[in-house]
Amino acid sequence: GEVRIREMKEMIQAIHEAGFGVIMDVVYNHTYSLDSWFQRTAPWYFYRVFPDGTVSNGSACGNDVASEREMCAKYILESVLYWTEEYHIDGFRFDLMGLLDVDLMNRIRKELDLRYGEGKKIIYGEPWAAEKTAVEGSKKLAAKENIGLLNKNIGAFCDSTRDGIKG
């Protein structure tokens, strides 16, 4: 509870005092179970579903969130801003960023830049997904094929990039 929150804040402060930054690994692309607060709050709004009713599982780990829907995007953005403001997080590594949409990732980058200065907070992620996802409409995902649509201060890495560099 409360003690753990204080301990985490003290840990981050000590890391900063030692001259290091803190990058938080975030998994916003899916939830483990459909028995979530998202589903309890607004059934099926926060999740991607294929036309046949199958819940999208592009992460191969759970249920894909619909980042292209406004309230889902708002939740993710406000969560990132909260961690940054309240805990002084220096950056974020987005797990399976390729399941989140380009507009949301650029919006996160823009908000962090407005509050802290251009590129002062680190953003990078995995520009891929394990499986196909049921993204709505013409929304573009923050996947390898759309890297050029992301803000220049959003980094990406994956096995194929690593292998290309290694040769």
Write out the residue ranges for each language-model feature.
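Substrate-binding/active-site clefts of carbohydrate-active enzymes
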Residues: 1-87, 97, 101-116, 122, ...
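Active-site-proximal helices and loops of the catalytic beta/alpha 8
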Residues: 18, 96-167
